[in-house]
């Protein structure tokens, strides 16, 4: 519901690690195509963004088997009176909330059937809330507040695959016996996540280094469209 509470195809861009400690992650690498982004003409900048935005579709296609497995597994749970939860922080969490909010008007589904949980709650939907994603225990508390149980499904969304809030939620779901699905935009060997189904959308480095609201966000929205629509047409 809209109410919010507290393996794929890679990029061919050359990778240059930035200086921070997350530089090993694919999403945090420097995209050589944008090293002089501020010096491009407007036409060249627009063309570069359009060219780079072809990569999300390639990434989603590369993850098609995991997406198919997730659709079937979620549909089976929902047919047995389970629910679907999206959980994330920042852009990843907002995209989950968006997809959940659009299910009732699109599919006439009850608002409790698909729910989005964003680290930091409603304020984080409108304003970045750094630090709120760093507590694994916060995810557990948010899931417990929704009555999350072993019949349910959790899709933990984290572009870089390292968000403690998402990791904590996935661990809780998996240990509870619920269906646990991870969605990230880095290879599993860079950031393994506890889950039964692992969806990796390898969009590569962003034109703005580390700004995963760009290609990673686009691929995530595409993947969530597939999950929710694929599931709903099977109910």
Each PLM stretch: what is its role?
Residues 52-62, 128, 153-156:
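Short, basic, glycine/proline-bearing loop/turn elements
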Residues 85-235:
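Glycine-rich phosphate-binding loops that contact phosphosugars or nucleotide phosphates
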Residues 37-41, 66, 131-138:
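Short secondary-structure boundary/capping elements
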Residues 2-59:
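Cofactor-/ligand-binding subdomain signature composed of acidic, glycine-rich
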Residues 62-77:
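A short, well-structured juxtamembrane/interface segment
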Residues 79-80, 175:
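Residues at the C-terminal ends
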Residues 45, 70-73, 142, 169:
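A ubiquitous structural signal for well-ordered alpha-helices
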């Amino acid at each position: 519901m809209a109410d919010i509470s507290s393996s794929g195809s890679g990029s061919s861009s050359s990778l240059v690690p930035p200086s921070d400690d997350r530089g090993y992650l694919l999403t945090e690498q420097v995209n050589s195509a944008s090293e002089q982004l501020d010096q491009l003409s407007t036409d060249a900048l627009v063309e570069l963004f359009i060219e780079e935005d072809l990569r999300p579709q390639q990434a989603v296609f590369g993850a098609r088997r995991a997406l198919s497995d997730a659709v079937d597994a979620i549909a089976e749970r929902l047919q047995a009176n389970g629910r679907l939860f999206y959980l994330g922080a920042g852009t990843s969490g907002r995209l989950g909330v968006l997809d959940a909010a659009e299910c009732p008007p699109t599919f006439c589904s009850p608002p409790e059937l698909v729910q989005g949980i964003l680290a930091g709650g409603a304020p984080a939907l409108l304003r970045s809330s750094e630090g709120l994603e760093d507590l694994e225990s916060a995810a557990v508390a948010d899931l417990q507040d929704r009555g999350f149980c072993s019949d349910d499904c959790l899709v933990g969304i984290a572009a870089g695959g390292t968000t403690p809030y998402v990791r904590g939620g996935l661990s809780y779901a998996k240990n509870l016996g619920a269906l646990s699905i991870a969605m990230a935009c880095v290879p599993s060997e860079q950031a393994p996540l506890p889950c039964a189904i692992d969806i990796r959308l390898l969009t590569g480095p962003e034109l703005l280094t580390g700004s995963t609201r760009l290609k990673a966000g686009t691929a995530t929205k595409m993947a969530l469209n597939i999950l929710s629509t694929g599931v709903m047409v099977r109910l």
